[in-house]
Regions:
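Non-catalytic accessory segments flanking enzymatic or RNA/DNA-binding domains
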Residues: 2-89
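Walker A/P-loop
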Residues: 106-133
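Conserved Walker A/P-loop ATP-binding site and its immediately adjacent core
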Residues: 127-163, 196
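Interdomain helical connector at the RecA1-RecA2 junction of SF1/SF2 helicase-like NTPases
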Residues: 269, 280-377
Length: 378
């Protein structure tokens, strides 16, 4: 089709156009559609897209993707959402197990709040699955407390771009909002750091701008990156932020440590998300029926046995994880308490860039390499 518009090639033989989007013209119900259907959506539903005449429109790639999505799904997409992917089997299983536990616990313990943990590695898609759980449970008010504020983008983007969450409201400290402007008829997702929302002001009270969070009875409180909070260290040490901006966003005055039992926020459900909740599990904080597990091995096993044409795991590469057993002599030094602290980022810190980069502790790094090569065995 483009060759009809641009039949003449450039002097170097290249095409005078570039294809930046290639989509299959099949609706979700299996029927086919033509470009005219996309043109109609661009003209009728996207008011900021200018029709230049014929098949030409002044628009962005995202505009076209959103229009195609509306044609495929048959769902109005005035918010210009560009994602419509579904749940993978393990995400559905995680949701089903959580729903079953929540319902069962509530029927037997009307005066208590159920807790559930998703112990799932990276690439599981915890944010998307958590939102789908909220939809299935019919939750309208969801509070996300994170122990690592850098994850906000993932929570915000899934809600803003996926067609399943059209009409949902997202707010955080970084978004410009007024609580009075909230539409109570639409689902609300509020995101913040646990230090900010649970921290106290200098007088020992709730921060003024967070009073509404404490006054709201949330349908669910989600603890993201829960393993950071499970260490029960001081708030500033717990957060080891990647940069000063993140630390500033995360900090809250007077929050000595996280203790959910004394949390001054009410909710009907708790959902915990973590890829490494080892301490929480080993301490007995969760029993087997309160946990859904998904490992890299589970992921790769699902990838190998997938039979359908489109494998949702195909883009997930195999990961090889190795562990190293420290020699007894080194363990003895650590257990005596003389040198019992270690910062991985500081140890491998480098100065310079590209070929001029060098380790700050080059001698120590070399000794570490010698160690894992068996130097202690000599």
């Amino acid at each position: 089709r483009m060759d009809e518009h641009y039949p003449t090639k450039l002097p170097n033989g290249a095409q005078p156009y570039k294809v930046i989007l290639n989509e299959v013209a099949i609706r979700n119900d299996g029927s086919l559609f033509k470009d005219h259907a996309v043109h109609a959506v661009l003209k009728k539903h996207f008011k900021d897209v200018k029709h230049e005449g014929g098949e030409w429109f002044a628009c962005t790639l995202a505009d076209v993707q959103a229009a195609i999505l509306e044609v495929k799904t048959g769902v109005r997409n005035e918010d210009k959402r560009t994602l419509s992917f579904g749940l993978r089997p393990e995400q559905t299983a995680a949701i089903d197990k959580a729903v079953q536990y929540f319902d069962s616990y509530k029927s037997e313990n009307t005066d208590k709040t159920p807790h559930f943990l998703w112990n799932a590695k990276m690439r599981f898609g915890k944010t998307f699955a958590a939102y789908q759980l909220a939809k299935k449970m019919g939750w309208k008010k969801v509070l996300i407390l994170t122990f690592k504020p850098a994850v906000q983008n993932a929570w915000e983007e899934d809600l803003a771009n996926h067609l399943d969450f059209a009409g949902w409201q997202f707010m955080s400290r970084k978004t410009d909002f007024d609580v009075a402007d909230l539409d109570k008829s639409k689902p609300l997702v509020c995101f913040g750091s646990f230090q900010d929302f649970l921290g106290k002001n200098k007088a020992g009270g709730i921060k003024a701008n967070n009073e509404w969070v404490h006054a709201t009875n949330w349908d669910c409180v989600i603890f993201d990156e829960y393993h950071y909070g499970a260490w029960r260290e001081s708030a500033k040490e717990l957060f080891e932020a990647e940069d000063k901006n993140e630390l500033e966003f995360a900090e809250g005055e007077g929050m000595a440590y996280f203790d959910e039992a004394n949390m001054p926020i009410t909710t009907g459900h708790y959902l915990y998300l973590s890829g490494t909740p080892f301490r929480a599990i080993s301490s007995g904080e969760f029993i087997e029926e309160q946990i859904f597990n998904w490992t890299y091995s589970d992921e790769q096993r699902a990838k190998e046995v997938w039979q359908d044409e489109v494998n949702p795991y195909a883009a997930l590469p195999r990961m090889v994880m190795l562990t190293y057993q420290l020699p007894p002599a080194i363990r003895d030094v650590a257990l005596k308490g003389e040198f019992n602290e270690f910062d991985l980022n500081e140890f491998f810190k480098a100065d310079g860039v590209d070929v001029n980069a060098t380790f700050k502790y080059e001698n120590e790094v070399q000794k570490w390499l010698d160690l894992i090569r068996g130097a202690m065995l000599e």
